[in-house]
Regions:
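Active-site adenylate/phosphate-handling loop in enzymes that bind or generate adenylated species
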Residues: 23-95, 141
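The feature marks non-catalytic terminal segments
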Residues: 105-154
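A conserved beta-strand->alpha-helix junction
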Residues: 1-16
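Short, well-ordered secondary-structure micro-motifs
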Residues: 15-16, 57-59, 151-153
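Surface-exposed cleft-lining segments at the edges of enzyme active sites
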Residues: 16-22
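Short, ordered loop/turn segments at secondary-structure junctions
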Residues: 8, 50-52, 112-113
């Protein structure tokens, strides 16, 4: 697959009086990915969200919005012919790091100065306290998101 890099000016899209945050920035990137995919006849977009991302998002939504929601492994849209897939949804961070090291991939770190406006670091810390980094416990949490027994919920 050919690598194409597209630079977008997310800051220029920010409305006056609004704060930059990870959610808004990522939605702008997904919008551009969607446009690119449709312009080139693609119907699937693979995103790099992994198990920890999904569980952190679930914790953030539960603890800030009182909502049980995360990021589904497959998200098909009705309004346009695109499906977002998350092929790394069952891989946690240590697994990805091990694989990257074995393959000799170059490591990169997010240096966005706006990441402090996100609750993800706190959610990551809470997830680590909850699971002690144990992959099996993370998988149980992931499975719980998919196996909701509403008869035993308020």
């Amino acid at each position: 697959i050919e690598l194409n890099i597209k630079t977008i000016s997310v800051l220029e899209r920010l409305k006056t009086g609004k704060k930059m945050n990870c959610w808004w920035c990522s939605s702008q990137r997904r919008l551009e990915l969607s446009k690119y995919a449709q312009e080139h006849g693609f119907n699937k977009i693979a995103l790099g969200h992994h198990l920890d991302d999904i569980l952190e998002t679930a914790l953030m939504n539960a603890l800030t919005k009182g909502e049980l929601a995360a990021m589904p492994p497959v998200l098909k849209f009705d309004k346009f012919p695109l499906t977002f897939i998350r092929p790394l949804c069952l891989a946690d961070i240590p697994m990805i790091i091990r694989h990257a090291e074995m393959q000799g991939y170059i490591s990169s770190t997010c240096t966005c100065s706006y990441q402090n406006n996100s609750g993800r670091k706190t959610a990551r810390s809470r997830l680590d306290k909850l699971t002690d980094g144990n992959y099996e416990l993370k998988r149980k949490l992931f499975d719980a998101l998919r196996n909701v027994n509403t008869a035993y919920l308020p």
